[in-house]
């Protein structure tokens, strides 16, 4: 069996282990969902028609998954039957059948599973429930505890092929949550040329995202493109900007996600959000999933203070990361993440990021270009010495440099007393200030007001981590 198939099967085995853990914990519905999805993925694997070993391995694995799914389904049925029996035992006795005394009871509703399949035998035995008045049913339920309705139609746009995503298996608020993170390639107009510096990062992203779409025949076998990358560095160095730029240049659908986007108060729904995120990324492929502050989502597992819900989300995320790296899946999904504290990442998650790149603070040339670019479109004096400003902003991040330029531009206003002006006088004064030039004195005042936001300790720790675990 070749290495590609072995690698894929290892990923499937990890997902099967997650399903077993869910089943052992009594989370049978979630285990059933994962097993069904896993069986679908295994069946869709494209393997050589002439390789009997690969066919036998896949069939054996499918039989094992099917056996586990039957056990899970039996547990779900047993739990439902027990719940129904307890409900009948604690409910009211069978009403008289005299139609003059009692109204005819309504027929029992079939109990449906999560996927719309009707349970066999449910409602065939036991007393039929009495008709419940509207007033009684409305009093028995707290409206605050009821999930919103499921009107998912029209939330998601069509993909490039004109197809619509079937989101009927998800609650509407879950679909809305993921839709809020998505920007189609027509909504993003940035370019890598807008990003100053970071030449090594641009090169790797160009090789991993743009070129495979232009010349896919080259990126085969060992040259298969990278699927996941994490950018580690101090805050304000342009990690988010470069993610948006590469998504625009490659005409990819862009998902920007934080830990709060993946959170829900409903048990099990956070995992569904993660699953839907990757399903939509594959549906709208080519796609880029950008996860900011990945350390808040993928921190070290096993900590004493870690909540069970957090572990479940991490497990689902790891499973989906492996799913998006299926070598037999031609739908291009690239996972790009950023962090300021990479040493907090879980080891299993760190392994899934094939490229781990250090993003340093901008050097003197990058700072000069950034000051010049920031001042474009703003009236300024020719006396401004950009070389001197670049030299005096050592230790500044890209965001700090932009903040310095904005402060200098605002300082034009502070050179004049506008506190006593009102109405037309204030409007006229502000209109004249639009043409006022930004001068050296404004930058001098800005340098006194703006300090570097990134501490040297953070910079050093990021560099040490990338020296130990980086992969360029």
Curated annotation (Swiss-Prot):
Biased composition (Polar residues): 134-143, 150-161
Effect recorded for residue 308 to D: In ct46ct101; null. Formation of an abnormally large polar body during oocyte meiosis II. Myosin thick filaments are disorganized in body wall muscles in an unc-29 (e1072) mutant background
Record lineage: Eukaryota, Metazoa, Ecdysozoa, Nematoda, Chromadorea
Family matches, as InterPro entries: AAA+_ATPase (IPR003593), AAA_lid_3 (IPR041569), ATPase_AAA_core (IPR003959), ATPase_AAA_CS (IPR003960), KATNA1 (IPR028596), MT-severing_AAA_ATPase (IPR050304), P-loop_NTPase (IPR027417)
GO BP: cell division; embryo development ending in birth or egg hatching; female meiotic nuclear division; meiotic spindle disassembly; meiotic spindle organization; microtubule depolymerization; microtubule severing; negative regulation of meiotic spindle elongation
Disrupted-gene phenotype: RNAi-mediated knockdown at the L1 larval stage results in the disorganization of myosin thick filaments in adult body wall muscles characterized by the formation of abnormal myosin heavy chain myo-3 aggregates and V-shaped crossing of A-bands. In addition, body wall muscle cells appear shorter and broader.
Protein name according to UniProt: Meiotic spindle formation protein mei-1
Organism annotation: Caenorhabditis elegans
HAMAP family, alphabetized: Katanin_p60_A1 (MF_03023)
Reactions catalysed: n ATP + n H2O + a microtubule = n ADP + n phosphate + (n+1) alpha/beta tubulin heterodimers
GO molecular-function terms, A-Z: ATP binding; ATP hydrolysis activity; identical protein binding; MATH domain binding; microtubule binding; microtubule severing ATPase activity; molecular adaptor activity; protein phosphatase binding
């Amino acid at each position: 069996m070749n290495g590609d198939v072995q690698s894929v099967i290892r990923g499937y085995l990890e997902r099967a282990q997650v399903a077993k853990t869910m089943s052992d914990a009594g989370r049978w519905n979630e285990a059933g969902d994962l097993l069904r999805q896993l069986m679908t993925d295994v069946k869709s694997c494209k393997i050589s028609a002439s390789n009997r070993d690969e066919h036998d391995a896949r069939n054996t694995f499918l039989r094992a998954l099917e056996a586990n799914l039957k056990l899970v389904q039996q547990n779900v049925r047993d739990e439902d039957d027990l719940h129904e029996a307890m409900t009948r035992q604690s409910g009211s006795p069978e009403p008289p059948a005299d139609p003059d005394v009692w109204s005819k009871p309504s027929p029992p509703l079939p109990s449906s599973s999560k996927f719309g399949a009707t349970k066999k035998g449910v409602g065939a035995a036991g007393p039929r429930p009495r008709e419940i008045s509207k007033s009684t049913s409305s009093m028995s339920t707290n409206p605050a505890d009821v999930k919103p309705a499921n009107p998912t139609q029209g939330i998601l746009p069509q993909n490039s092929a004109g197809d619509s995503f079937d989101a009927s298996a998800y609650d509407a608020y879950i679909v809305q949550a993921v839709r809020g993170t998505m920007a189609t390639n027509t909504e993003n107009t940035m370019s890598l040329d807008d990003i100053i510096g970071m030449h090594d990062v641009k090169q790797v992203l160009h090789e991993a995202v743009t070129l495979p779409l232009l010349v896919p025949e080259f990126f085969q076998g060992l040259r298969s493109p990278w699927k996941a990358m994490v950018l580690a560095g101090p805050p304000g160095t342009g990690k988010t900007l470069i993610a948006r730029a590469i998504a625009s240049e490659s005409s990819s659908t862009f998902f920007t996600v934080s830990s709060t986007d993946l959170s829900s108060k409903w048990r099990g729904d956070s995992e569904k959000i993660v699953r839907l995120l990757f399903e939509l990324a594959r549906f709208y492929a080519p796609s880029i999933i950008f996860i900011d502050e990945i350390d808040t989502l993928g921190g070290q597992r096993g900590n004493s203070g870690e909540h069970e819900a957090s572990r479940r989300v991490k497990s689902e995320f790891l499973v989906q990361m492996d799913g998006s790296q299926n070598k037999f899946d031609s739908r291009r999904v690239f996972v790009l993440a950023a962090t300021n504290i990479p040493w907090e990442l879980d080891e299993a998650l760190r392994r899934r990021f094939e490229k781990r790149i250090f993003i340093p603070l901008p050097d003197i040339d990058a700072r000069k270009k950034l000051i010049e670019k920031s001042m474009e479109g703003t009236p300024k004096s020719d006396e401004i010495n950009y070389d001197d400003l670049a030299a005096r902003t050592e230790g500044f991040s890209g965001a700090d440099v932009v903040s310095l330029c904005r402060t200098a531009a605002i300082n034009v206003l502070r050179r004049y007393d506008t506190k006593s002006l009102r109405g037309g006088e204030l409007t006229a004064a502000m209109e004249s200030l639009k043409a006022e030039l930004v001068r050296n004195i404004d930058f001098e005042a800005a340098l006194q007001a703006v300090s570097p936001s990134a501490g040297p300790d953070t910079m050093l720790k990021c560099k040490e981590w990338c020296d130990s675990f980086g992969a360029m």
